[in-house]
Amino acid sequence: MKNIRKACVEAIFREFENECDAIRPAAGDGWDEIEARRSLGHIVGCIDLDVTDLVDIVVDTINKEL
Protein backbone atom coordinates (compact mmCIF):
# COMPACT_ATOMS: atom_id res chain seq x y z
CA MET A 1 0.00 0.00 0.00
CA LYS A 2 2.88 2.37 0.78
CA ASN A 3 4.17 2.04 -2.81
CA ILE A 4 0.75 2.88 -4.24
CA ARG A 5 0.48 5.95 -2.01
CA LYS A 6 3.94 7.14 -3.05
CA ALA A 7 3.13 6.57 -6.74
CA CYS A 8 -0.10 8.59 -6.42
CA VAL A 9 1.71 11.49 -4.74
CA GLU A 10 4.38 11.45 -7.46
CA ALA A 11 1.71 11.39 -10.18
CA ILE A 12 0.02 14.47 -8.72
CA PHE A 13 3.33 16.35 -8.49
CA ARG A 14 4.09 15.40 -12.12
CA GLU A 15 0.69 16.74 -13.12
CA PHE A 16 1.55 20.04 -11.45
CA GLU A 17 5.05 20.20 -12.99
CA ASN A 18 3.58 19.65 -16.46
CA GLU A 19 1.18 22.57 -15.89
CA CYS A 20 -1.83 20.41 -16.73
CA ASP A 21 -5.48 21.10 -16.02
CA ALA A 22 -5.96 19.25 -12.72
CA ILE A 23 -3.92 21.80 -10.76
CA ARG A 24 -3.69 25.31 -12.18
CA PRO A 25 -3.48 28.92 -11.02
CA ALA A 26 -6.79 30.26 -9.75
CA ALA A 27 -6.34 33.45 -11.76
CA GLY A 28 -4.50 34.11 -14.99
CA ASP A 29 -1.11 32.63 -15.71
CA GLY A 30 0.24 32.66 -12.15
CA TRP A 31 2.33 29.48 -12.34
CA ASP A 32 5.26 31.33 -10.73
CA GLU A 33 3.12 32.04 -7.67
CA ILE A 34 2.54 28.33 -6.95
CA GLU A 35 5.20 26.30 -5.19
CA ALA A 36 5.64 22.53 -5.00
CA ARG A 37 7.06 21.42 -1.66
CA ARG A 38 7.73 17.77 -2.35
CA SER A 39 9.46 17.11 0.97
CA LEU A 40 6.28 18.16 2.78
CA GLY A 41 3.90 16.74 0.20
CA HIS A 42 2.33 20.15 -0.40
CA ILE A 43 1.51 22.35 -3.37
CA VAL A 44 1.16 25.89 -2.05
CA GLY A 45 -0.45 28.93 -3.61
CA CYS A 46 -3.70 30.23 -4.98
CA ILE A 47 -4.79 27.25 -7.07
CA ASP A 48 -7.83 25.85 -8.83
CA LEU A 49 -8.19 22.09 -8.35
CA ASP A 50 -10.16 19.99 -10.78
CA VAL A 51 -11.18 17.23 -8.37
CA THR A 52 -12.47 14.94 -11.13
CA ASP A 53 -9.10 15.12 -12.92
CA LEU A 54 -7.24 14.48 -9.65
CA VAL A 55 -9.37 11.41 -8.97
CA ASP A 56 -8.65 10.16 -12.50
CA ILE A 57 -4.90 10.57 -11.88
CA VAL A 58 -5.13 8.61 -8.63
CA VAL A 59 -7.29 5.83 -10.10
CA ASP A 60 -5.06 5.51 -13.18
CA THR A 61 -1.97 5.34 -10.97
CA ILE A 62 -3.49 2.68 -8.73
CA ASN A 63 -4.46 0.60 -11.76
CA LYS A 64 -0.88 0.81 -13.08
CA GLU A 65 0.54 -0.24 -9.72
CA LEU A 66 -1.72 -3.27 -9.27
Across the structure, where does each feature detected by a protein language model lie?
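Protein-protein interaction and targeting regions used for scaffolding, dimerization, and localization
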Residues: 1-66
